[in-house]
Every structure is written in structure tokens, then in C-alpha cells.
Design a protein with these regions (language model features):
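A carboxyl-terminal module marker
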Residues: 1, 65, 79-217
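Extended, well-folded interaction surfaces typified by the phenylalanyl-tRNA synthetase beta subunit core
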Residues: 1-49, 213
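A residue-level signal for beta-strand positions that form part of recognition/binding surfaces
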Residues: 10, 45-48, 69, 121, ...
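Generic, well-ordered alpha-helical scaffold segments in large soluble proteins
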Residues: 16, 31, 35-39, 54-57, ...
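Residues forming anionic-ligand binding surfaces in small-molecule and nucleic-acid pockets
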Residues: 9-14, 54-79, 176-183
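A structural supersecondary motif
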Residues: 48-54, 60, 212
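Domain-wide signal for the mature, well-folded portions of proteins, strongly enriched
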Residues: 34, 45-50, 72, 78, ...
Length: 217
């Protein structure tokens, strides 16, 4: 409550000894934001993570729908919000590429929790399946954590990530000729993602085009 995060309606413990633990959490992020608040005086730049379980309501048998989640929250007074956000994004990308040998996708998401930013929130995708969210904390919550700090978070459904098929490792024969990098400047619509743009050259330049990446925005 000190952070302005509302306690959402969810499964409750019967005969709870403390009203603060009565409602079972449906997300790990609020817990991490409280942990961040408790540690802001110890460091200007840090991150925390947790693999834990949450409950998303009840099933048809009136039993708790339990989900295993990976939650990561980064806090920094020395990095701007863009740098911190892409640092978290890169953590998730490396995790996916090292374990599943696949790239992640992202699409715009609508906030469903009071701590989520109304604009800067995205769904994490793998094989066109939703596995989590990544975003910036709501400005109101961020100011109560620290007025000068940047705070970003991500939460991944571990079961959905585990269920994704692992791609085989493929080795390409080294080129006989030295590689050449080309810098190309393009102007794209404001809401166009690089993932969508990259579909334009899939299957093109076979044997010549080895890869593409954004070097500046």
C-alpha cells in the first residue's frame, strides 16, 4: 500500500493470522517492488530475481490455478530508463537463445495491474505463444520508490517457456571470403517493430545475407 499498489481480488487464506498475508499473490512483481524499496539506500544500481509460484484464481474443481514464474526487477539511479529496459530485454533474449536456441518476440500489451505503465508494457512471445510481460513501472509507483530512479520489470511463465520446443543447433560453413558489414538507414512508421520489419528479408539473399540488427534508433 505504501507504493500505491492495490491489493487485487484473488484467492484468500482462511483464518489468516495477519491481514497482510490474507490474499495470495497473483504476481511476484509487487513483492519485488517492496524489496527494491527496502534496498534503495544500499545501492544506486541493482537487480533482483525470484522463481516462485502465484495463483491465478480457481479452476472448475474449485482448486487453485498455480503457476510457476520467473520475475526480474532492475533499479538504477545511474542508467536512463531506455538503457535499463534494453538491459532487461537482453537478459531475456540471451536466456531464450541459450536454452531454446530461439529469438523472442514482443508485442504491445494492455496493463492489467496498477503497477504497470499504461504505455510501455509488452508481451513476451516465443513461437507466437505468450510467455510473459516486460515493462516499466507506473510513474506513480516509480516516484514512491525513488523520484530519480529508473525501474523496469519482467515476469515469465516458466511452464509456458519450458513447453516451447527447443530448436536444434545448426552450424554454417564458414565463408571463403571476409564478411562485409553494410549500414543502411531507413525511416519506418512509429509503431513498426523490428521483428515485423525483418520478415521482409526472410529467405532473401540466401548464402549472402548472414544477419541483421539495429545499431541505433
Amino acid at each position: 500500500k505504501a507504493l500505491g499498489i492495490e491489493v487485487e481480488n484473488n484467492v484468500k487464506l482462511a483464518n489468516a493470522t495477519n491481514p497482510n498475508i490474507e490474499t495470495i499473490r497473483n504476481s511476484i512483481i509487487p513483492t519485488q517492488l517492496c524489496q527494491v524499496k527496502s534496498n534503495t539506500s544500499y545501492s544506486n544500481d541493482f537487480g533482483i530475481f525470484e522463481i516462485g509460484r502465484v495463483v491465478k484464481g480457481l479452476d472448475e474443481n474449485n482448486l487453485c490455478i498455480e503457476q510457476k514464474k520467473l520475475a526480474i526487477t532492475l533499479f538504477s539511479k545511474v542508467k536512463d530508463i531506455k538503457t535499463l529496459y534494453f538491459e532487461l530485454r537482453d537478459m531475456l533474449v540471451v536466456l531464450s537463445e541459450d536454452i531454446k536456441h530461439k529469438s523472442l518476440g514482443f508485442k504491445k500489451a494492455e496493463p492489467t495491474h496498477s503497477y504497470e505503465h499504461p504505455v510501455n508494457l509488452y508481451t513476451i512471445m516465443i513461437d507466437n505463444e505468450e510467455i510473459g510481460t516486460i515493462g516499466i513501472v507506473h510513474p506513480t509507483v516509480g516516484k514512491k520508490l525513488d523520484k530519480k530512479a529508473s525501474v523496469v520489470f519482467a515476469e515469465v511463465d516458466m511452464n509456458a517457456f519450458t513447453d516451447a520446443q527447443t530448436a536444434p543447433i545448426v552450424y554454417d560453413e564458414p565463408s571463403k571470403f571476409p564478411p562485409i558489414d553494410y549500414d543502411i538507414s531507413v525511416v519506418v512508421p512509429e509503431k513498426l517493430f523490428f521483428e515485423d520489419l525483418s520478415k521482409c528479408w526472410i529467405g532473401k539473399g540466401e548464402g549472402i545475407l548472414k544477419g541483421t540488427k539495429i545499431v541505433d534508433t
